């Protein structure tokens, strides 16, 4: 059974957290480019404190507020900034408006996967292999519905299913899957329609939007465990 539930309904289930624009896309990109770990942090103040308390870790500070760089941080929330040259071997303290809070809220699940359009096919196939009860947690924008996260949920559902493997889901899951089928092959068009996508374009972040709209460019499986996001071995 796959639901898109309230965050509190996660005990005994496998959760998938999605924030396409841009937190989970950026986390996936950083890990694919060799980052050691990504630690979701709730506030800039907490990030600064953790970095001060652990100077030997040489944390990279990444994140945003209102879609722009936090003063004193090394990187904002653009996946394009998390290059191999910048992140390889580095632990990252990461705080964003929506995504990192959603990841932390999902901690009560038995396992928490981090998904974006980049790795949605890989996550969907992994969930199909596991045959578990899944909760898809869309971060949205300020806890409100978002097109980009919903279409990513639909992509995961589509890749979970097969000719002999129907996926049982709730109504929101059905809507998500139909949205993906409608926009498969032109996901950038949908992200341009979304309110968050339009905001990024207004801020001059068109390249971020196009990057985040790519489907299936990564095969990694990031998981949130013991307070940090790492790649599943």
Curated annotation (Swiss-Prot):
HAMAP family named among the record's database cross-references: ComB
Essential cofactor(s): Mg(2+)
InterPro entries xref list: ComB-like, ComB-like_sf
Class of enzymatic activity (EC top level): hydrolase
Family label: Belongs to the ComB family.
Enzyme Commission number(s): 3.1.3.71
Pfam families with a match to the protein in the record: 2-ph_phosp
Domain of life: Bacteria
Keywords, sorted A to Z: Hydrolase, Magnesium
PANTHER family (UniProt xref): 2-PHOSPHOSULFOLACTATE PHOSPHATASE-RELATED
GO molecular function terms attached to this record: 2-phosphosulfolactate phosphatase activity; magnesium ion binding; sulfopyruvate decarboxylase activity
Keyword Hydrolase belongs to the record: yes
Listed name of the protein: Probable 2-phosphosulfolactate phosphatase
Catalytic activity line of the entry: (2R)-O-phospho-3-sulfolactate + H2O = (2R)-3-sulfolactate + phosphate
Gene3D superfamilies, per the entry: ComB-like (3.90.1560.10)
């Amino acid at each position: 059974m796959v639901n898109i539930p309230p965050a509190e309904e996660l005990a005994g289930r496998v959760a998938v957290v999605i924030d396409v624009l841009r937190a989970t896309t950026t986390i996936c990109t950083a890990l694919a480019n060799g980052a050691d770990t990504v630690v979701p942090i709730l506030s800039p103040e907490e990030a600064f404190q953790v970095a001060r308390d652990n100077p030997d870790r040489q944390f990279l500070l990444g994140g945003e507020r209102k879609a722009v760089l936090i003063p004193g941080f090394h990187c904002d929330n653009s996946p394009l900034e998390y290059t191999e040259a910048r992140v390889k071997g580095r632990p990252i303290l990461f705080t964003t408006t929506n995504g990192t809070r959603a990841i932390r809220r999902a901690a009560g699940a038995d396992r928490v996967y981090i998904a974006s359009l980049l790795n949605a096919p890989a996550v969907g196939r992994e969930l199909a292999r596991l045959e578990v009860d899944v909760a898809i947690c869309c971060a949205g924008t300020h806890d409100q519905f978002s097109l980009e996260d919903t279409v990513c949920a639909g992509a995961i559902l589509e890749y979970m299913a097969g000719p002999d493997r129907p996926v049982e889901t709730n109504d929101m899951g059905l809507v998500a899957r139909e949205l993906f089928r409608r926009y498969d092959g032109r996901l950038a068009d949908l992200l341009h329609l979304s309110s968050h996508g339009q905001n990024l374009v207004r801020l001059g972040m068109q390249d971020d939007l196009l990057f985040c709209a790519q489907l299936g460019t990564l095969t990694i499986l990031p998981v949130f465990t013991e307070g940090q996001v790492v790649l599943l071995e």
